[in-house]
């Protein structure tokens, strides 16, 4: 055979071997090759690229060369590996990509599932928000209703208290006592000169007002009278009078004096002095009994002075009148004996008998009343005639006047101050004079 025929035969045999080996190739080799050992691949490629020369051996013995090719298995395996390696590498790459995709798919699925769960949660949140929105829509109505009820309650509570605030009374004294509203609007309790209430003391037969009495007004058609406590008018609202014993003895003597005299005495019935309205004091001198002098309104610019009638007994002209005269001076010592008291009586006797005769010219010396006293010795001389003049006007016209028609004059702070000082000094001097007279006797 020619060498060309041999070469063809070898090529065919190699092809068959390669075909048979590709089908009968072991799997572990494929697994090893699939593991991707690059060093072995490079070695196989080098072996396949540079095979051992076999021409000489084949030329010598063609049949032996055909039957026993040198390193045929090795070369065939190397060729098969070189041929199949790229294919398997491609397959493994696709598989790896598929595996990577499969590994990624669960992640995406997991990511999708929480998204669904999140959607469900969002839907639940939306439902809750809807419910809360509905609740908020319903709750403002409730809150408005509660606010309205609270406002109505507060408003009604306030309205219940409003009439109490409006019904608070205010009387003339400013005490706010609701009991005073039972009486009429013009029914005001009487006042003394210094702003204190009148305190009437009921007597057996009545008593004439002495020089230290605060105020007295004649009652129509009655010769008896009630005496006002002289110490209560000068004291404060919380002070307690300390001369109850002296006052009782003085009232007893005045009761007898008033019964013996039979003349019109000052009187005051508690609660009967009612202010019936505003009074024009300019019309009083000619109509209401000359309570105020005709020139005193303009001379004193509205200041009112009180002038009161006084009654003394016939039996005790000297003692009673001189006792009242001593009440005008605080200079008489309390522990004086016969000489000092007699000097004071002699010095005052003439003056007081003259004033008594001027005030009762028709009835003699027995009815001569005492002059109302003051504490200021400098003002006695200047005001003696003034008071006597008013005393004459006061006695006769006031005898038949009704107490309802008479009205109280306007109150002034100066007159209050002077009246209060006179009342206090007169009460103190009367008590001191009575003690000195007892020591002198």
Swiss-Prot record:
Annotated TM spans: none
Residue ranges, annotated region (Disordered): 137-441
Name listed for the protein in its UniProt record: Matrix extracellular phosphoglycoprotein
Tissue and organ expression note: Expressed in osteocytes (at protein level). Expressed by chondrocytes, specifically in the hypertrophic zone of the bone growth plate (at protein level). Expressed in osteoblasts in bone (at protein level). Expressed by osteoblasts within the metaphysis (at protein level). Expressed at low levels in white fat, brown fat, testes, brain and aorta. Expressed in the craniofacial complex (at protein level). Expressed in odontoblasts, ameloblasts and in predentin during tooth development (at protein level). Expressed in the kidney (at protein level).
Signal peptide: 1-24
Domain comment as written in the entry: The acidic serine aspartate-rich MEPE-associated (ASARM) motif is sufficient when phosphorylated to inhibit bone mineralization by osteoblasts and cartilage mineralization by chondrocytes by binding hydroxyapatite crystals during the mineralization stage. It can also inhibit dentin mineralization.
Family per record: Belongs to the PF07175/osteoregulin family.
Disruption of the gene: reported phenotype: Mutant mice exhibit increased cancellous bone mass and no loss of trabecular bone characteristics. They also exhibit decreased biomechanical strength in their bones and increased skeletal mineralization. In craniofacial complex development, mutant mice also exhibit hypermineralization in predentin, dentin and enamel of teeth and decreased expression of AMBN, ENAM, IBSP, DMP1, DSPP and SPP1. Mutant mice also exhibit hyperphostatemia and increased expression of SLC34A1/NPT2a, SLC34A3/NPT2c and VEGF in the kidney. Hyperuricemia and reduced fractional excretion of uric acid was also exhibited.
Localization: Secreted, Extracellular space, Extracellular matrix; Secreted
Annotated region described as ASARM motif, given as residue ranges: 424-441
GO cellular component: extracellular matrix; extracellular region
Modifications the protein undergoes after translation, according to the UniProt entry: Phosphorylated on serine residues in the ASARM motif; the phosphorylation is important for the inhibition of bone mineralization.
InterPro entries, A to Z: MEPE (IPR009837)
Domain of life: Eukaryota
Biased composition (Basic and acidic residues): 313-325
Other information: It has been proposed that MEPE is cleaved and generate 2 peptides dentonin and ASARM peptide.
Keyword Secreted among UniProt keywords: yes
Subunit and partners: Interacts (via ASARM motif) with PHEX; the interaction is zinc-dependent.
Alphabetical UniProt keywords: Biomineralization, Extracellular matrix, Glycoprotein, Phosphoprotein, Proteoglycan, Secreted, Signal
Gene for this chain: Mepe
Comp. bias regions, Polar residues: 211-223, 349-358, 391-405
Motif mapping: Cell attachment site: 183-185
GO biological process, any: bone mineralization
Function (record text): Regulates renal phosphate and uric acid excretion. Regulates bone mineralization by osteoblasts and cartilage mineralization by chondrocytes. Regulates the mineralization of the extracellular matrix of the craniofacial complex, such as teeth, bone and cartilage. Increases dental pulp stem cell proliferation.
């Amino acid at each position: 055979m020619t060498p060309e025929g041999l070469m063809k035969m070898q090529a065919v045999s190699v092809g068959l071997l390669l075909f048979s080996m590709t089908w009968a190739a072991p799997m572990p080799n494929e697994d090893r090759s699939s593991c991707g050992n690059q060093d072995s691949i490079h070695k196989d490629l080098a072996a396949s690229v540079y095979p051992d020369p076999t021409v000489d051996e084949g030329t010598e013995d063609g049949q032996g060369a055909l039957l026993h090719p040198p390193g045929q298995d090795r070369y065939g395996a190397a060729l098969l590996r070189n041929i199949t390696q790229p294919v398997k590498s491609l397959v493994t790459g696709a598989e790896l990509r598929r595996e990577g995709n499969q590994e990624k798919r669960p992640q995406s699925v997991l990511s999708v599932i929480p998204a669904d769960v999140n959607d469900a949660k969002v839907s639940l949140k939306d439902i809750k928000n809807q419910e809360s929105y509905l609740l908020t829509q319903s709750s403002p109505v409730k809150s408005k209703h509660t606010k309205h009820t609270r406002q109505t309650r507060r408003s009604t509570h306030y309205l219940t208290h409003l009439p109490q605030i409006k019904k608070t009374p205010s009387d003339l004294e400013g005490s706010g006592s609701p009991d005073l509203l039972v009486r009429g609007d013009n029914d005001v309790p009487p006042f003394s000169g210094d702003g204190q209430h009148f305190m009437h003391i009921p007597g057996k037969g009545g008593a004439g007002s002495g020089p230290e009495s605060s105020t007295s007004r004649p009652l129509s058609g009655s010769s008896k009278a009630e005496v006002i406590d002289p110490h209560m008018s000068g004291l404060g609202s919380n002070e307690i009078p300390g001369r109850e014993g002296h006052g009782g003895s003085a009232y007893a003597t005045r009761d007898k004096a008033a019964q013996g005299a039979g003349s019109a005495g000052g009187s005051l019935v508690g609660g009967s002095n009612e202010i019936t309205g505003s009074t024009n004091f300019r019309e009083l001198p000619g109509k209401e009994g000359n309570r105020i002098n005709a020139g005193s309104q303009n001379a004193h610019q509205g200041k009112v002075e009180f002038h009161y009638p006084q009654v003394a007994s016939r039996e005790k002209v000297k003692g009673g009148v001189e006792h009242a005269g001593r009440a005008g001076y605080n200079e008489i010592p309390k522990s004086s004996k016969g000489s000092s008291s007699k000097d004071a009586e002699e010095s005052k006797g003439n003056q007081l008998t003259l004033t008594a005769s001027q005030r009762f010219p028709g009835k003699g010396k027995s009815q001569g009343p005492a002059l109302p006293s003051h504490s200021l010795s400098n003002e006695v001389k200047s005001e003696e005639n003034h008071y006597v003049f008013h005393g004459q006007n006061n006695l006769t016209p006031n005898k038949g006047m009704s107490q309802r028609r008479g009205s109280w004059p306007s109150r002034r702070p100066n007159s209050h101050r002077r009246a209060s000082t006179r009342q206090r000094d007169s009460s103190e001097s009367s008590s001191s004079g009575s003690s000195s007279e007892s020591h002198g006797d």
